[in-house]
Amino acid sequence: MLQPPYGDNLPQNGFIPGNLSYTPPDISHPNPAIQINVDPKSTRLQVLEPFGPGPVGEFTDLQVMLKVKGKCTTDHISAAGPWLKYKGHLENIAHNTLNGALNADNDKVNVVKNVFSGKEGAIHEVGREYQALGKPWIVVTDHNYGEGSAREHAALQMRYLGCPLILARSFARIHQTNLKKQGVLPLTFADPADWEKMHGGDVIESTEGVADLVAGRPGKNDTPEGGEILLHVRRPDGEKYVIKALHTMSKDQVEWFRKGSALNAARG
């Protein structure tokens, strides 16, 4: 009869008990009553206020503030280097928003026109001006928008400055998800050639499909990977046209969008 194999692989007398005095760390119990004090004069730290909820219906009157041409990495969107000291202060680091982006309409870097004042300014400046006027704005971008390091601020800053939607020829996957986490709707052109049609100064008068998306209703031409959103656009000269765009929002991501951010959704 065969005998089971034997080997002296384990100590015959067992293991040494070890340090019996070890005490595991306490499990933390968050206390919302505790106040975290941040100096309001600090340039490095700022208490982050939750973003507001997403739309309950269609978007209307979205200003196309910028059409980006060519490569636009997360470093173009939110530069590192000396800006890193402001990572804890969203208002301050937002001054670098898209400061490396090339404007397809004027071939200038970080220069856009405020259609309400007629003056040119840095992208973050005009974004704040639009926000002060209650005018949501969007960016039209080229291929592989947001490639590079997975920089959360590249999405945070866009949302903070009042950009609820970005329309791209294509997105870098991680940045696309980061935008969704911050309540920004990333759309791609159904036909990438339609990028040529749009310009800064155009206005998306209304969307068609966002209301169904946030309500959880089946949309036009939905697929397991997403669905279709139509953009009804008006040029400055009054000419109108329609852009067919696509989204890739999952059920969970729609909830982030509806609540205003993934953090809002997690908080309930």
Predicted regions, residues:
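Fe-S-dependent hydro-lyases/dehydratases of central metabolism
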Residues: 1-268
